[in-house]
Amino acid sequence: MAKKSKIAKEKKRQQLVLKYAELRKELKEQGDYEALRKLPRDSSPTRLKNRCELTGRPRGYLRKFKMSRIAFRELAYKGHIPGVKKSSW
């Protein structure tokens, strides 16, 4: 489990990205890079890091399921993820 402060910081970044997304888009279309520079750093979508929604783990992230490989494996074995089953051939 990731530190709660790291998870909270990432959620704050996500909110800032959503808040400034429209303004950022308009400024880019106008080519006003000076105004873009004055926006908060955390409002840039490139600063976002994918984290597991259950544990907050930043590595081993599966985009399709929005969780880490470890959480995915646990839930898949329990049958809590629809459409996922253990492969065999």
UniProtKB/Swiss-Prot annotation:
GO terms for molecular function: rRNA binding; structural constituent of ribosome. NCBIfam families: PRK08881.1 (NF006477). It comes from the Bacteria. Keywords: Ribonucleoprotein, Ribosomal protein, RNA-binding, rRNA-binding. Binds 16S rRNA, required for the assembly of 30S particles and may also be responsible for determining the conformation of the 16S rRNA at the A site. One of its GO terms (biological process) is translation. One of its GO terms (cellular component) is cytoplasm. Belongs to the universal ribosomal protein uS14 family. The gene is rpsN. PANTHER family: 30S RIBOSOMAL PROTEIN S14 (PTHR19836), SMALL RIBOSOMAL SUBUNIT PROTEIN US14M (PTHR19836:SF19). Part of the 30S ribosomal subunit. Contacts proteins S3 and S10. It comes from Bacillus pumilus (strain SAFR-032). This is Small ribosomal subunit protein uS14A.
